[in-house]
Design a protein with these regions (language model features):
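Canonical AAA+ ATPase core
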Residues: 84-89, 110, 114, 122-213, ...
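Phosphate-binding P-loop
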Residues: 29-35, 43-44, 94-97, 134-136
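Conserved alpha-helical scaffold flanking the Walker A/P-loop in AAA+ ATPase domains
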Residues: 27-30, 83-103
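P-loop (Walker A) phosphate-binding loop of NTP-binding proteins
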Residues: 43, 77, 145
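Walker A/P-loop
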Residues: 32-69
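Walker B catalytic acidic pair
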Residues: 42, 105-106, 117
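C-terminal engagement/docking regions of AAA+ P-loop ATPases
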Residues: 232-311
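Dynamic helix-loop-helix/coil hinge segments at AAA+ ATPase domain boundaries and subdomain interfaces
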Residues: 1-24, 212-214
Length: 311
């Protein structure tokens, strides 16, 4: 199979377990190919765990899930050193993050210290325990979920932490027809029975192919112009950082690869910008008072910034 056929096969296989959410699956896979992590804002019970299991099966990855609660400790994520009386030495006991695909469920119920431990692993690709450093397996993907802010026992993730996630999306309720189909059979069981389409090494190769997608200088300038517009907007108190433009660039390349191209276009930028950038901006007090949202302000900016004409 060529690259496009492989990507289509991955989506088709995961779609067997996740009904009616093709757009969500495409966004998640795009972020995975871009080398990023995924943050999902939604209520419990809409299929987030099923999606995670479906992708790990289809991509041939090891998988661990942790339910975040206030009593979860950083060592539960990173691991710890334990004295081995037989050898007389300390040995490392791996934590939940020592895996390919880590589902951090309800991350905004954990303490800030525990959240920071996970985000450090996400950023560095390694973890430190008692002065020793351990690399996490590659590829390493974190899918974190959080309940809507204001739910019992939740605390809002600060901007510095949400900025570490490549994309922030919602799943939403299924349609009436799809919910009926869900009732007819167990989607979780369907996810567990999925076949691996690729191996972890194949995924690393796909990531390299995404990174090699050609981007014209004028398209880079377009991304920077979008970021600059967020920094200058009166509706925004905190605009897109350079990390945000780097994420936009990576997602643009990955989206082009998803479409079967080895070059990026302005349409790729516009396709990924809403869910790559909206969680990276902070609205001003006046904008919030006026009922504006990050998505609506960003949409207006995307419509106002001139698109480049590629040669």
């Amino acid at each position: 199979m060529n690259t496009k056929e492989t990507i289509d096969a991955i989506l088709a296989e995961t779609g067997k377990a996740v009904l009616g959410k093709d757009d969500v699956l495409r966004r998640i896979l795009t972020a995975i190919l871009a080398g990023g992590h995924i943050l999902i804002d939604d209520i419990p019970g809409v299929g987030k765990t099923t999606m995670a299991v479906a992708f790990t099966r289809t991509l041939g990855l090891d998988y661990k899930r942790m339910q975040f609660t206030p009593d979860v400790l950083p060592s539960d994520i990173t691991g710890f050193s334990m004295y081995d009386k037989d050898s007389g030495n300390f040995r490392y006991v791996a934590g939940s993050a020592m895996t390919n695909f880590f589902l951090a469920d309800e991350i905004n119920r954990a303490s800030p210290k525990t959240q920071s431990a996970l985000l450090e692993v996400m950023q560095e690709g390694r973890l430190s325990v008692d002065g020793k450093t351990y690399a996490v397996p590659q590829p390493f993907i974190v899918m974190a979920t959080q309940n809507p802010f204001g739910s019992s026992g939740t605390q809002e993730l600060p901007e510095s932490q949400t900025d570490r996630f490549m994309i922030r999306i919602t799943v939403g309720y299924p349609s009436r027809e799809n919910e009926i189909e869900i009732l007819k059979g167990s989607r979780r069981s369907a996810a567990l029975s999925l076949s691996a389409v690729i191996t972890p090494d194949d995924l690393l190769s796909l990531r390299k192919a995404a990174a090699d997608v050609h981007v014209e200088d004028s398209l880079f300038a377009y991304m920077v112009d979008i970021a600059a517009a967020t920094r200058e907007s009166h509706d925004i108190s905190l605009g897109i950082s350079p990390r945000g433009t780097m994420a936009l660039s990576a997602m643009t390349r990955a989206h082009a690869l998803m479409e079967g191209r080895n070059y990026a276009t302005p349409d790729d930028v516009l396709a990924v910008a809403p869910y790559t950038l909206s969680h990276r901006i902070t609205l001003s007090g006046d904008a919030r008072f006026a009922g504006k949202t990050a998505a609506s302000v960003l949409d207006a900016i995307l419509k106002s910034v001139p698109m480049p004409e590629l040669v």
